Regions:
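Acidic/charged, solvent-exposed loop-and-adjacent secondary-structure segments enriched in E/D, K/R, S/T
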Residues: 1-15
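Gly/Pro-enriched, hydrophobic low-complexity segments
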Residues: 19-20, 24-133
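Gram-negative outer-membrane assembly/targeting C-terminal domains
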Residues: 124-150
């Protein structure tokens, strides 16, 4: 999921790749006003919204929200800009993300910006990689539970 956010892609939590049947889980609001079309996904306590440009399909903003009476509310907002061509794809050379949570009993916010001067790749480089087996999967609820103990 984090890799998909960085690469400015739609994703389904827990899935490595999207296929035609998985795309049916997304809702698209083609009647939206403005320059973007919201693509949304609801999964349990989490909501995902990707705002795609109506002209070229690039995602300008992704918002991931987690709501829980027990763990509070958390929101990740990821903004994309300064798109540049990398091979045949458009890549956001500037990315800003803000994470806000009440899981710590008081509202806390962290913000980071990646502003890349140049984006290049080498030939034969695999865009989609897999996480090494030495790492174990940690569920969102477990991360929030750890934050709660801070």
């Amino acid at each position: 999921s984090l890799q998909s956010l960085f690469w400015n892609q739609l994703f389904l939590p827990g899935k490595d790749r999207l296929n035609e049947s998985s795309l049916r889980q997304f809702n698209v609001n083609l009647q939206s006003s403005g320059t973007t079309t919201p693509v949304s996904l609801h999964q349990g306590n989490m909501d995902f919204v990707w705002n795609a440009d109506k002209q070229n399909g690039t995602i300008g903003q992704t918002t991931v929200s987690y709501r829980s009476q027990q763990h509070g509310n958390s929101t990740l907002t990821w903004l994309y800009s300064n798109f540049t061509t990398v091979g045949v794809k458009s890549f956001p050379a500037k990315q800003s993300f803000t994470f806000t949570t009440t899981a710590t009993r008081q509202k806390q916010t962290v913000q980071a910006t990646l502003d890349m001067d140049e984006v290049t790749t080498k030939d034969n480089w695999e865009v989609n990689s897999t996480v090494s087996s030495k790492y174990k999967k940690i569920e969102t609820k477990d991360i929030l539970a750890k934050i709660m103990t801070l």
